[in-house]
Amino acid sequence: IQSVDDIIARSLKYSDLAVSMGIGAIRTHVDTCDDQLKGVQALLEVKNSVKDYLYLKLVAFHQDGLYRDPSALENTLRALDMGVDIVGGIPHFERTMSDGARSITTLCEVAAERGLLVDMHCDETDDPMSRHIETLAYETQRLGLQGRVTGSHLTSMHSMDNYYVSKLIPLIAEAGVHAIPNPLINIMLQGRHDTYPKRRGQTRVRELRDAGVLIGFGSD
């Protein structure tokens, strides 16, 4: 069982490696499923240790889903109280589509109340009916969070029909929601239930970019 010190040691080692490769800023998702919040404790310590040479921002990420775990919301709020910077979520991992939408509403309201950014693992699936990015764009506008919200992965857009996407992308752009594709991991994870042809599972980068959506590639 890993300790807080174990996580600190690995994270400091990685931070030094990142800086040696010319990286000056990192946004990382810290797991809040652990009731002891060991990862949160560790990465807040690391953030303070590297602040003079690495801009480190932490996302509170309950990867088991906000409504699948009774302690999820409490742990997320505790992590934010401790100093984690950004509100995260994973709506497509909830038990139902409606729970996924509800989780987006709850987490965006938390961010709005606290003046924080949002970074959601959103629609990381091959299911074209996973459309949580639409809800994320709506809540962004409803709560006045334009420019402060990011949808990560967005791989279901690879499988959506073009008619729906022609509506969706303008909504994303209108809301000022940013996109972070993670191509190296999604080319491995997506399409794993396919036979042939296999989907590559990449979101629609060119269409998003052409619509004015700010895009930054990530690594998962």
PLM regions: where:
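Short, conserved beta-strand edge motifs with alternating hydrophobic and charged residues
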Residues: V59, S152, I180-P183, G216-S219
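C-terminal helical cap
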Residues: A18, H178, P183-R199
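Short beta-strand segments at enzyme active-site cores
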Residues: I23-H29, K57-L58, D119, F217-S219
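Conserved short loop/turn motifs at secondary-structure junctions
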Residues: H29-D34, H62-D64, E94, E124-T125
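Histidine/acidic residue-rich metal-binding segments in metalloenzymes
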Residues: K38-V50, R68-T150, L154-H178, T195-I215
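Alpha-helical scaffold segments that flank or form the walls of functional sites
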Residues: I1-H29, L37-S49, E74-D81
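Active-site mouth loops of central-metabolism enzymes
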Residues: I1-A9, V59-S71, P91-S98
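Conserved SAM/AdoMet-binding glycine-rich loop
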Residues: Y53-Y55, V59-H62, H153
